[in-house]
Amino acid sequence: MRFDAADAHWRETPRPGASGAQKDWLTRGGSLTAHLARLGRVTVRVTREAVATPWADERGALACAPRAPVWVREVVLAVDGTPFVAAHSIAPLAASKGVWQAMRRLRTRPLAELLYSDPEVTRSALVSRRVIAGHPLFALASHALSPGHATPHAFAARRSVFERRGTPLMVTECMLPALWRHLDAHGERRARDFEGA
């Protein structure tokens, strides 16, 4: 079976109003953690690991029933201490004890270590959308913001489905305003390149 994260809201082409940096980062393949590492020191803070039910827009992508249990891992990826990305990953509960059991043992290591080191893992196309209040991802991203920063009207997010031995693991990544501010100010240069300047 081919798993696909696209639907009426999640599309392969970023929305027309997206900035150049947003279009680039929403469609950029490879490891997001590795791309962030070009900007500075990346740390992973795990905010949730639990059994849950999939969000409404996740069920179709994973071909699972509405109340089917899934294993959820949520993290915040920070660069030099500033939160840049809130990520939400899910796999069928049985798979989290089988094919994808390694995701339960990552702790503060990035999921990329698991996904990009295994030749058996394939990835669907990246899809993206604008996330506004009412979507559970909006709440997740809002909680990940640095203290004192106002919540934006919307967030840019992307997702894709990784497959191993016919079993899916979906990763959704929500870009936080600090990422766009950094790119606007410095481009892709590492933050420490500016220290002592």
Curated annotation (Swiss-Prot):
Subcellular location(s) of the protein: Cytoplasm
Listed InterPro entries: Chorismate--pyruvate_lyase, Chorismate_lyase_/UTRA_dom_sf
Pathway recorded for this protein: Cofactor biosynthesis; ubiquinone biosynthesis
Pfam families per the UniProt record, alphabetical: Chor_lyase (PF04345)
Keyword hit for Electron transport: no
Family, per entry: Belongs to the UbiC family.
HAMAP family: UbiC
Summary of the function given for this chain in its UniProt record: Removes the pyruvyl group from chorismate, with concomitant aromatization of the ring, to provide 4-hydroxybenzoate (4HB) for the ubiquinone pathway.
Protein's name according to its UniProt entry: Probable chorismate pyruvate-lyase
Origin species: Burkholderia thailandensis (strain ATCC 700388 / DSM 13276 / CCUG 48851 / CIP 106301 / E264)
